[in-house]
Amino acid sequence: MALTTEQKSAILAEYGLHEKDTGSPEAQIALLSKRIADITEHLKKHKHDHHTRHGLMALIGRRKRLSKYLADKDIERYRALIERLGLRR
């Protein structure tokens, strides 16, 4: 369920601002989106796993706060990111 180092590296290479970027909002939102997608797939099989569902809601909230921060800081970067990730908003 956790992201492997290779998966993280691939996501950071695609969405990071530079090679070693792990802290930009774009990189963090992309990593959270991948984790959210993986957990959502897990919950489709294990419908009664309420502890994981609670953790999923926390991740969604964190992604929402980071998205709001990016939208307030630079709306063009925000729009480009949600287009690339295919997120609603």
Swiss-Prot record:
GO MF entries: rRNA binding; structural constituent of ribosome
Assembly with partners or alone: Part of the 30S ribosomal subunit. Forms a bridge to the 50S subunit in the 70S ribosome, contacting the 23S rRNA.
Name of the protein: Small ribosomal subunit protein uS15
Segments crossing the lipid bilayer: none
Keyword Transcription regulation among UniProt keywords: no
Similarity field: Belongs to the universal ribosomal protein uS15 family.
Domain of life: Bacteria
InterPro entries: Ribosomal_uS15, Ribosomal_uS15_bac-type, uS15_NS1_RNA-bd_sf
CC terms in the record's Gene Ontology section: cytosolic small ribosomal subunit
Function, in words: One of the primary rRNA binding proteins, it binds directly to 16S rRNA where it helps nucleate assembly of the platform of the 30S subunit by binding and bridging several RNA helices of the 16S rRNA.
Keywords: Ribonucleoprotein, Ribosomal protein, RNA-binding, rRNA-binding
One GO biological process term: translation
Coiled-coil stretches: none
PROSITE patterns: RIBOSOMAL_S15
Pfam families reported in the protein's UniProt record: Ribosomal_S15 (PF00312)
Species annotation: Nocardia farcinica (strain IFM 10152)
